[in-house]
Design a protein with these regions (language model features):
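The feature marks proteins involved in alpha-glucan
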Residues: 1-19, 46, 54, 58, ...
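Hydrophobic faces of well-ordered beta-strands that scaffold small-molecule active sites
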Residues: 158-160, 202-204, 266-268
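Aromatic- and acidic-residue-enriched carbohydrate-binding clefts of CAZyme catalytic domains
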Residues: 173-184, 214-261
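Structural beta-strand segments of beta-rich domains
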Residues: 21-25
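Carboxylate/His-rich catalytic cores and anion/metal-binding grooves
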Residues: 194-221
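Short proline/glycine-enriched turn/loop motifs at strand-loop junctions of beta-rich domains
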Residues: 28-34, 66
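A conserved hydrophobic secondary-structure block that centers on an alpha-helix together
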Residues: 165-202
Length: 269
């Protein structure tokens, strides 16, 4: 992956967009002086690709033959001016705010922080890449069939607020491997239970990609509820039975399709 062909690409849509021949990458920044796209292989080896095209503050590049499952992040060179909110540092791998899938998690290594703990005014130049999630190029292809939102009138709605993991974790008729996952919620046993209650919509507590707070991790605990999102366009990878290589997106879509087929709407908290 050392010889990367690059085309100018386009500024929109933001994030990573695969079109069948390659992937367009675009990142918005008003203050960046230079942006690099970091690509990672299965072993974590990194290749940096300069993003030299800029339109309306959107830095962009198209990479032929770079496709589904590619791990990536951004590195931004620019002002270091914490008092004005600018902490640009190319040693920090930045998450794509428009990513649709993530692999891995934040492990709260000191390199994840922009500053040194002993001197908060000092810039921390340790590379954070080994300690943060990588965005993943996901597949835009999915067979929705004849899917349509049930569109139940509000006065007829029965909404069940639920936690994907909690709702499916102990259901005796859901296979062990599917408990706590999107696929578990799509299982016939889960759907039949909801239908028996007369439920017309499920309101899912946070399913966006989120992090486990450092103070919880230090105590061997986890952020159960998920109200700490870092990727609003990506389904949380730990709720996927299929893994976090982008398959979580397909699994999430399959869950929505199955619920819709049962006449159940899906609302995100």
């Amino acid at each position: 992956m050392t010889d990367i062909e690059t085309w100018p690409g386009r500024p929109y849509p933001l994030g990573a967009t695969y079109d069948g021949t390659g992937t367009n990458f675009s990142l918005f920044s008003e203050v960046a002086e230079a942006v690099e796209l970091s690509l990672f292989d299965d072993d974590g080896a990194e290749v940096r690709v300069p993003m030299t095209e800029v339109d309306a503050f959107c830095w962009h590049v198209f990479l032929p033959r770079i496709g589904i499952g590619q791990r990536y992040g951004f590195r931004v060179t620019g002002p270091w001016d914490p008092s004005n909110g600018h902490r640009c540092n190319p040693n920090k791998l930045l998450l794509d705010p428009y990513a649709k899938a993530f692999e891995g998690a934040v492990d709260w290594h000191p390199s994840c922080f922009a500053y040194d703990f002993d001197d908060p005014d000092t810039r921390n130049d340790e590379d954070s890449a080994p300690h943060v999630p990588k965005a993943v190029v996901e597949s835009p292809y999915f067979d929705w069939g004849a899917d349509r939102p049930p569109d139940v009138p509000l006065h007829e709605s029965v909404i069940y607020e639920m936690h994907v993991k909690g709702f499916t974790a102990t259901h005796p008729d859901i296979p062990d491997l599917l408990r706590g996952t999107y696929a578990g919620l799509a299982h016939p046993a889960a759907i039949e239970h909801l239908q028996s209650l007369g439920v017309t919509a499920v309101e899912l507590q946070p399913v966006h990609q989120f992090i486990h707070d450092s103070h919880l991790v230090e105590r061997g605990l986890r952020n159960y509820w998920g109200y700490n999102s870092i990727g609003y366009f990506a389904p949380h990878n730990e709720y996927a039975s299929a893994g976090d290589d982008g398959s979580q997106v397909t699994e999430f879509k399959g869950m929505v399709r199955s619920l819709h087929e049962a006449g159940i709407e899906v609302i995100l908290d």
